Amino acid sequence: LYDPEKSVHYLNLASTVAGLEDAIPVTSQLYELLKQQNIQLPVLADLRKLPYTKATEIYEYMYDQYWKKCTHRLLISLPPQRGFVRDLAVASGAAIVWLDARDWKENTVLRKFMKTMQPGESIITGWYAEERSGIGLATEYGLSTIPSDFYENTTVYAGMQQQIQYPEIPKMPALENKIYLALYMSDGDNVQYCQHAMSELWDKKGRGVIPINWTISPGLVDFGPGLLNHYYTTATPNDFFASGPSGMGYSLIYDAHNYLWNATSGTDFTPYAKLTQQYLEKSGLRVITIWDEVNQEQMGAYVRNCRYLYGLTQQDWERRPYKVPTYIQDHKLAFVPNLPCYANGVDVIYSFWRDTIAKFDGSHPIFLSAQGESWKMGPDNIVALKKRLEELSPGNIVICRGDHFFNLHNQANYLPFNLTLLPKMKITSSPTSTETKFAAD
């Protein structure tokens, strides 16, 4: 029993207790209605007796009395008034909190929960009062976040047991002295975007005409394998999927807006990189988009622990005194800047690329990458963008899938690349139960 009039945060406490006690959270009014219908249920916890009115007090009480009983593999960050993803918390015995990392008192309580979770095993789901402060605080403790505060029917989608049906990998084009461009659609780390807005973009005219790189959450392997299979089985050869930032769950290693490193050590970053590799294997994803940047120690952690990767992009928000360069880590793995990195339309991408493309002299291949804000662009806009770019350098524009982009980049720079993707490469094998076409991946 709880009283939302005393504080709405009692609903989160009641939901948490309900998950642990196999009970239901009920207000006084609803309790009376149940009794009127002769539904006599025992009261396992009467939270109305508690004297607390502040969020910090209520979640301190939750931490002291119930956190040790909760699973520490999952923490739900969710406004009390919101029902989405709450079913997952109750089903899994997870705690539900709503604390603002910008408020130092609430920040202190939130840290109590996070510091007792396990990097590389635990994740946070839901969302935060403010993006960068919340994601940044979780990153500080080696934790990543699956944005899901509007994800519907979580336990239904997560309860599906499905073998992931990986899309076939087409051959990449032959390397020439041309302009290779990769265009990424943002926000795929957000599983409710994958459930709703992405499906609307997916059905728009123009998809499949030219290569588009769709960011998607590797966490859908657990959160919604049916959703992942929907996109994989309806994809064209021009649809490529990349992991949203910055691997298994949203992690903000360097916050370029606030000039703040939330994590600096490659060693501390390793559990996240190892967790990411597990989900790259399960989801079949081989490119990651990073928000915002990582240092070279952390690049090394990706190289050592994420052996499936072809490459990664970083976000150049132009908040440095220099442009973010392309890094090649350990003579193997490329970290390429997205510039622009969160364009609010194709006109922005065109303006960033125009001069470089217009000055192209054909002496060697060049590689440019950009990420567009999914809410403000779609396949039809990208098709129109290609036509405009071709006018700047006729016959030289090659828009690429992400896997092709990084393999062509490595081939051009005499770095390791996947030979099976070469257009004239033929793959044969001795008798096997696996089709040889899968050797390309």
Regions found by a protein language model. Give the residues of each.
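Short, solvent-exposed loop/linker segments at the N-terminal edge
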Residues: 429-440
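Acidic (Asp/Glu)-rich catalytic clusters
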Residues: 173-175, 200-207, 223-246, 280, ...
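Active-site beta->alpha N-cap acidic-glycine motif
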Residues: 152-232
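Catalytic grooves of carbohydrate-active enzymes
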Residues: 117, 186-209, 219, 283-422
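Preference for solvent-exposed, low-hydrophobicity sequence contexts
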Residues: 1-158
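A recurrent domain-boundary module in secreted/ectodomain proteins
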Residues: 145-167, 402-426
